[in-house]
């Protein structure tokens, strides 16, 4: 998906679904998850998606839309180092109750 406006729609849906999976309602977190490109933390695709019972499978191509799911992606798969599960990140950020400094 090359169209940035289409990818922005995908990111907004991802943010809403991620917070719902974590059972969180926080507009600031939802905005943050929608605004920050996940692919910036994963390097160039195709990417390695982690699947239970413990193996990584490459994405079909390097389309960043494939990253906007509540799944782990391998950074160093042979060492089982991944980027972390988005809903867990959301839950931890919500629990931290970070406040804006003005």
Task: Place the predicted regions along the sequence by residue.
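Class I SAM-dependent transferase core
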Residues: 1-102
